[in-house]
Amino acid sequence: MNLEEYKKIVKERYPIDPKNLPYYIVYDDFLFPHEFGTLKSYMSSEFPWGISNKLNYDDQNPYLVKKIYDVENRAREEWTAGVDEMPFIAITSRIGMVAMLRLKANMYLNSQVQDIHYPHIDYQFPHQGALFYLDDCDAPTYMSDGVGIESKPNRLLLFNASTAHSSSAPTNINYRQTININYFGGGIRSEYLRMLKDPTVVSEHVPFTITTHGGR
């Protein structure tokens, strides 16, 4: 679908809840170079991808996916066997989480035309989302207000994952990889931000205060 169709569907199906407002913050150069290199190498070589026949209930496009952590799994089985969780800890350890709900990797294959996927929410209840990008391509993530967050290597998007958003597939590279985290909590840990001389916020829409420990 095009952007106007996307915004129309979001307005009709996902009206804004004053008690659960959308927000987004984008950080570039989020990981240190050696951490990003380790993660990128793992995702591009030995990572055990699976396939899903559809993106969500309303979008039948197939894509590659792998759950790495799921709180709904049985006790002591939340982390998926056969996946090395260590490369992902570099991301999760820098986020002010109270509890993680899900951690998964997505891969969208090349599309012949630019097309926005059907909008969705990750969970029905209020929670936070973090989306980490590994590739430079023409496949943005679209927020509920229609703003497209471009896919750039080592970029982190923090957003309200219980409000409408959508992915898209690239036309200028073979695939687009992202790491999607759903959690209860707040923003980037303050001690990590202090390690960065000038943390680069490239896009921001926050109609309230989001803290490290999850307060608003």
Language-model regions: role of each:
Residues I149-H165:
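Conserved metal-binding segment of the jelly-roll/cupin
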Residues A130-F132, I173-R189:
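A short hydrophobic beta-strand segment most commonly corresponding to one strand
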Residues G96-N106:
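A short coil-to-beta-strand element that immediately follows conserved catalytic motifs
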